[in-house]
Amino acid sequence: MVEWTDFERATIKDVFSKIEYEVVGPAALARCLVVYPWTQRYFGNFGNLYNAAAITGNPKVAKHGITILHGLDKAVKNMDDIRNTYAELSVLHSEKLHVDPDNFKLLADCLTIVVAAQMGKAFTGEIQAAFQKFLAVVVSSLGRQYH
């Protein structure tokens, strides 16, 4: 069980209240697909992913990026039970989609970069620490089925 400080809880809720899902979600997923091209293999039904322009302009990438952020809302609302919150999603990604769990960390890193760019100087080291702790718990929960 993860212990959250009052500061961490407030920070996570505050960061997610400021995120523009329609901008950040697509940008984070697109960045992941561009920077780590091997992650594209899980999105074969998304059509053209041949270069950065195609990826960033792909409406299926954008839609799934938004879906990912809305999925993170569940963790924000259930910070004391993220593991069980993502139990079914963990099974889906491991048993049906066969996603390499290391890719969750790559996406989390890309999301951190995009959020930091959006927030600018307001994304202090303390805020980043809380945000990355939160994402690490999410990544661990999504990868739980693999262990």
From Swiss-Prot:
Coiled coil: none annotated. GO terms for biological process: hydrogen peroxide catabolic process. The gene is hbb. Belongs to the globin family. It comes from the Eukaryota. It holds the Pfam family Globin. GO terms for cellular component: blood microparticle; haptoglobin-hemoglobin complex; hemoglobin complex. Hb 1 is a heterotetramer of two alpha-1 and two beta chains. Hb 2 is a heterotetramer of two alpha-2 and two beta chains. Residues 3-147 form the Globin domain. Heme b binds at residues 64, 93. It comes from Cottoperca gobio. Red blood cells. This fish has two hemoglobins: Hb1 and Hb2. They display the Bohr and root effects. Keywords: Heme, Iron, Metal-binding, Oxygen transport, Transport. GO terms for molecular function: haptoglobin binding; heme binding; metal ion binding; organic acid binding; oxygen binding; oxygen carrier activity; peroxidase activity. This is Hemoglobin subunit beta. The keyword Cell membrane does not apply. PROSITE patterns: GLOBIN. Involved in oxygen transport from gills to the various peripheral tissues. InterPro entries: Globin, Globin-like_sf, Globin/Proto, Hemoglobin_b, Hemoglobin_oxygen_transport.
